[in-house]
């Protein structure tokens, strides 16, 4: 009530906005100074170029005046750069302080939320709830064991020794069948191996003729190669 009458609420709102406004204004002014800095550097370069031109023309008076302007602009540039450095430091400090403030506010809100959550809890209630959960878990395990228990009784159980004997008999039968297959295959293959197949002889005259034709072809190719070489040498001598 009293705070609203004396305007404390509005002042608190203004205090919250003041850091942000200060940061914005500082950044704007730093940008303005940065533009001024670039302009002054351009003027310094121009004055130096004018001094060089006047010297080449032999006009030392005008060259000296250009250098004086350059010195004046350099002094102004130094002041602008110093102001920029101070404002950048101030901006960094305000941003850091504002970040700390916002962090503190967030942590306070988190603490309030945790307090609200824990207001309806105490250690006794937690222990009681955990005991109930453990009981239900144990009950669930017992139910799972009961459901997964086999329904076969002792009267329906199979003799393991009897199963082993039957398995050995099946293995012996398989071995006998494989042996009989091997014997039958050997018996059927024996007559075929005894028969000899005679093949006709191959004439050798055609082979000799083909060899001679190949040699003749190679000799003709060698002669053609020599002719081509001679022709190329003649063309080279004639400059063709």
From Swiss-Prot:
Family matches, as Pfam families: Snf7
Main location: cytoplasm
Modified-residue entries (Phosphoserine), positions: 119, 193
UniProt GO MF annotations: identical protein binding
Record keywords: Cytoplasm, Endosome, Isopeptide bond, Membrane, Nucleus, Phosphoprotein, Protein transport, Transport, Ubl conjugation
Effect of residue 121 to D: Leads to severe sorting defects
Membrane topology: Peripheral membrane protein
Effect upon mutating residue 52 to E: Impairs the formation of protofilaments. Also impairs the formation of protofilaments. Also impairs the formation of protofilaments. Also impairs the formation of protofilaments
Gene3D superfamilies linked to this entry: 6.10.250.1710, ESAT-6-like
PANTHER family linked to this entry: CHARGED MULTIVESICULAR BODY PROTEIN, GH13992P
Quaternary context: Core component of the ESCRT-III complex (endosomal sorting required for transport complex III). ESCRT-III appears to be sequentially assembled as a flat lattice on the endosome membrane and forms a transient 450 kDa complex that contains DID4, oligomerized SNF7, VPS20 and VPS24. SNF7 polymerizes into spirals at the surface of lipid bilayers. SNF7 polymerization is nucleated by association of SNF7 with VPS20; the process is terminated through association of VPS24, possibly by capping the SNF7 filament. Interacts with VTA1; the interaction requires DID2. Interacts with BRO1.
UniProt-recorded name of the protein: Vacuolar-sorting protein SNF7
Protein source organism: Saccharomyces cerevisiae (strain ATCC 204508 / S288c)
Organism phylogeny: Eukaryota, Fungi, Dikarya, Ascomycota, Saccharomycotina
Chain's gene name: SNF7
């Amino acid at each position: 009530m009293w705070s609203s009458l004396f305007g404390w609420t509005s002042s608190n709102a203004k205090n919250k906005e003041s850091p942000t406004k200060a940061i914005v204004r500082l950044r704007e002014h730093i940008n303005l100074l940065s533009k001024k800095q670039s302009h002054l550097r351009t003027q310094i370069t121009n004055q130096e170029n004018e001094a060089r031109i006047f010297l080449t023309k032999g006009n030392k008076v005008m060259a000296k005046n250009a250098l004086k302007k350059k010195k004046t602009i350099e002094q102004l540039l130094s002041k602008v750069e110093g102001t920029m450095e101070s404002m950048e430091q101030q901006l960094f400090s305000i941003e850091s302080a504002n970040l700390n403030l916002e962090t503190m506010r967030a942590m306070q809100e988190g603490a309030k939320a945790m307090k609200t959550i824990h207001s309806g809890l105490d250690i006794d209630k937690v222990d009681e709830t955990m005991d109930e959960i453990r009981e239900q878990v144990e009950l669930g395990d017992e139910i799972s064991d009961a459901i997964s228990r086999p329904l076969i009784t002792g009267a329906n159980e199979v003799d393991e020794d009897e199963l082993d004997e039957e398995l050995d008999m099946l293995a012996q039968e398989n071995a006998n069948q494989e042996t009989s297959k091997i014997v039958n295959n050997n018996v059927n293959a024996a007559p075929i191996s005894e028969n000899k197949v005679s093949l006709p002889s191959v004439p050798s005259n055609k082979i000799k003729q083909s060899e001679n034709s190949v040699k003749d072809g190679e000799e003709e190719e060698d002669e053609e190669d020599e002719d081509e070489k001679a022709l190329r040498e003649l063309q080279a001598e004639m400059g063709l």
